[in-house]
């Protein structure tokens, strides 16, 4: 019987070049008679039968590999069967079935594509190691990629440039780039995938390389290059995600982190991340505590509470499948300097991170110098780099009205270029970026008139009022306490009198207290008062006799001298 089956096998192999259909029929006859005829299963694979059952039977009978071929005096290389091992990286990466290991590789990759990750990994357990470590590493990288375990993909392909199989080494570069992109490491992904485009694997992996390069470049702000790649994909390898990305410039790759991968309750299920909300809850508590600590700012606190409530309810409605108005998260903080705008911006960053709207409670403080360059065409580049630093957090632009300045009655072209870039990124990165612009109300209004699209980008405007004289006193006391200092009653009275005077005077059309800087004015008074106190105490002949009260107290004379000094320095004296 063995000789008969061997004869049938030899006939089938001989027919493969002329009639694969007839060859497949003969290989099938053999396997119907003997399910352990591994070589016939391999023949079926060589004829295009890569059904799961076929792959399983070939793998299950792999210990019989070469027996029929040996009896027929045929080399298994002569069968010419190849098995797909590219997985998510390419349908065109195949490997010659010249050993039981090749069968195992193909079977494991197919099992992973069906979501049977554990079976796939178990199939590799008895794979021969000596001399074939790179093959096993590649298949593991494919399995981990199918399960979106990107950190382990990188572990498997690290050092692939030393693999003896240069084609698979190049494919490993693609796997590394794909993993980097899914981890949000877009610069590294761009580098790896660009290099892969100049290797033997470029054609086999072309759709994957183009897709992830497009997503990496879009996330880096290179929309023009992303569009070129997406259009090429649409023309050659159309699929729904490509169409969606072409239609919506805000379409982004959904990334993860090593921490999230490690937090999965099921290592193969990306949706099984056990959410640890304690850090977010802590951010919300800290944000509320910081807001409560602020003196005055009644209207601001109410508006921040409304902003938080609207954002929180929108997240809850969306989670329950309800319609949610797509309102902008960008904000305007309008008001004089020293009224707590930067502090409240930090509160907003904590709130948004606590609610999961942004990735981290990051606040990037900026001004005109971070956006506007000295040469034409460079402001766009500079602006994009600044925005990239803020992605995943909040970009705070103080004195935003200085972005675009008038020059001899003409609009500043460099500032306009920066503003145009900012507007585009605010829209394209709206899911990863919150922008807060700050400045005097009238100046902010003038900025909003510069560009027609600017005003519509901001759904929330919060007005910051000047501090009252009483609030300046309270702020001064808080600042002093933080420094282990204390204003005596006379010193506090001096601060109240000075603040009242400034609130009733105008300089250049603005309240003198605003020119002085409100809260910053209070800090300068306290710091100058501490200096005067220290100079007074330094004249004491007996330092050991100085008590804590004496070392901390700022008296009326100390503060009177401080007020005179600060007013002179700020040029706001009588």
Curated annotation (Swiss-Prot):
Report the gene knockout effect.
Increases efficiency of DNA conjugation when disrupted in donor strain. Loss of DNA conjugation when disrupted in recipient strain No effect on secretion of EsxA or EsxB. EsxB secretion was not seen in this disruption in strain MDK8.
Q: Say if the entry is tagged with keyword Secreted.
A: no
Q: Which domain of life is it from?
A: Bacteria
The UniProt keyword set, sorted, is:
ATP-binding, Cytoplasm, Nucleotide-binding, Transport
Q: Which residues bind ATP?
A: 335-342
Q: Which InterPro entries match?
A: AAA+_ATPase, ATPase_AAA_core, CbxX/CfxQ, CbxX/CfxQ_RuBisCO_ESX, P-loop_NTPase, T7SS_EccA, T7SS_EccA1-like_N, TPR-like_helical_dom_sf
Transmembrane segment boundaries: none
GO MF annotation list? ATP binding; ATP hydrolysis activity
> Where does the UniProt annotation locate this protein?
Cytoplasm
Q: Which CDD domains match?
A: AAA
Give a GO cellular-component term.
cytoplasm
Q: Taking the first listed entry, what is the main subcellular location of this protein, grouped into a coarse class?
A: cytoplasm
Give a Pfam family name: AAA
Q: Which Gene3D superfamilies match?
A: 1.10.8.60, P-loop containing nucleotide triphosphate hydrolases, Tetratricopeptide repeat domain
Do you know which NCBIfam families this protein is assigned to? T7SS_EccA
Q: How the protein assembles, per its UniProt entry? A: Part of the ESX-1 / type VII secretion system (T7SS), which is composed of cytosolic and membrane components.
Q: What does this protein do?
A: Part of the ESX-1 / type VII specialized secretion system (T7SS), which exports several proteins including EsxA and EsxB. Plays a role in DNA conjugation, in both donor and recipient strains. EccA1 exhibits ATPase activity and may provide energy for the export of ESX-1 substrates.
PANTHER family reported in the protein's UniProt record: AAA-TYPE ATPASE FAMILY PROTEIN / ANKYRIN REPEAT FAMILY PROTEIN, AAA-TYPE ATPASE FAMILY PROTEIN _ ANKYRIN REPEAT FAMILY PROTEIN
What the record says about family reads: Belongs to the CbxX/CfxQ family.
Name by which UniProt lists this protein:
ESX-1 secretion system protein EccA1
**Species annotation:** Mycolicibacterium smegmatis (strain ATCC 700084 / mc(2)155)
Gene behind the chain: eccA1
């Amino acid at each position: 019987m063995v000789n008969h089956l061997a004869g049938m096998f030899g006939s089938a192999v001989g027919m493969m070049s002329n009639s694969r259909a007839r060859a497949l029929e003969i290989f099938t006859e053999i396997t119907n008679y003997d399910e352990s005829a591994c070589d016939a299963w391999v023949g079926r694979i060589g004829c295009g039968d890569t059904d799961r059952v076929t792959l399983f039977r070939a793998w299950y009978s792999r210990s019989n590999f070469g027996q029929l071929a040996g009896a027929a005096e045929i080399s298994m290389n002569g069968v010419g069967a190849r098995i797909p091992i590219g997985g998510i990286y390419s349908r065109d990466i195949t490997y010659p079935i010249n050993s039981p290991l090749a069968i195992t590789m193909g079977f494991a990759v197919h099992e992973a594509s069906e979501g049977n990750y554990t079976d796939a990994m178990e199939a590799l357990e008895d794979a021969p190691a000596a001399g074939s470590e790179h093959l096993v590493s590649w298949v593991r990288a494919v399995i981990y990629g199918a399960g979106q375990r990107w950190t382990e993909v990188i572990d498997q392909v690290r050092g692939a440039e030393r693999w003896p199989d240069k084609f698979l080494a190049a494919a490993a570069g693609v796997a590394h780039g794909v993993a980097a992109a899914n981890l949000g490491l877009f610069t590294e992904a761009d580098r790896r995938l660009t290099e892969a485009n100049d290797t033997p694997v470029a054609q086999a992996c072309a759709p994957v390389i183009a897709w992830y390069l497009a997503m990496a470049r879009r996330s880096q702000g290179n929309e023009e290059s992303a569009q070129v790649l997406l259009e090429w994909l649409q023309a050659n390898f159309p699929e729904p995600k490509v169409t969606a990305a072409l239609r919506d410039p805000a379409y982004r790759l959904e990334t993860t982190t090593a921490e999230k991968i490690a937090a999965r309750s099921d290592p193969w299920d990306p949706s099984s991340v056990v959410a640890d909300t304690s850090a977010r809850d802590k951010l919300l508590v800290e944000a509320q505590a910081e807001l409560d600590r602020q003196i005055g700012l009644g209207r601001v606190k109410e508006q921040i509470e409304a902003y938080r409530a609207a954002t929180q309810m929108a997240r809850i409605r969306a989670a329950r499948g309800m319609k949610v108005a797509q309102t902008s998260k960008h904000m305007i903080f309008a008001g004089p300097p020293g009224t707590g705008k930067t502090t409240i911006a930090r509160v907003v960053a904590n709130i948004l991170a606590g609610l999961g709207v942004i990735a981290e409670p990051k606040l990037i403080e900026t001004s005109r110098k971070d956006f506007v360059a000295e040469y034409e065409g460079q402001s766009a580049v500079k602006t994009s780099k600044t925005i990239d630093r803020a992605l995943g957090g909040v970009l705070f632009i103080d004195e935003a009205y200085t972005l675009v300045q008038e020059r001899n009655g003409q609009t500043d072209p460099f500032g306009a270029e920066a503003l145009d870039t900012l507007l585009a990124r605010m829209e394209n990165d709206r899911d990863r970026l919150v922008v807060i612009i700050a400045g005097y109300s009238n100046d902010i209004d003038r900025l909003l008139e510069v560009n027609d699209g600017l005003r519509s980008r901001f759904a929330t405007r919060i007005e910051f009022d000047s501090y009252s004289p009483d609030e300046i006193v309270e702020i001064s006391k808080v600042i002093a306490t933080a420094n282990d200092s204390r204003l005596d009653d006379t010193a506090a009275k001096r601060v109240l009198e000075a603040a009242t005077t400034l609130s009733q005077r105008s300089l250049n059309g603005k309240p003198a207290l605003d020119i002085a800087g409100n809260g910053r004015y209070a800090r300068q008074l306290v710091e100058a008062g501490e200096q005067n106190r220290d100079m007074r105490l330094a004249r004491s002949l007996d330092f050991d006799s100085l008590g804590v009260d004496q070392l901390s107290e700022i008296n009326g004379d100390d503060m009177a001298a401080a007020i005179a000094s600060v007013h002179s320095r700020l040029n706001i004296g009588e």
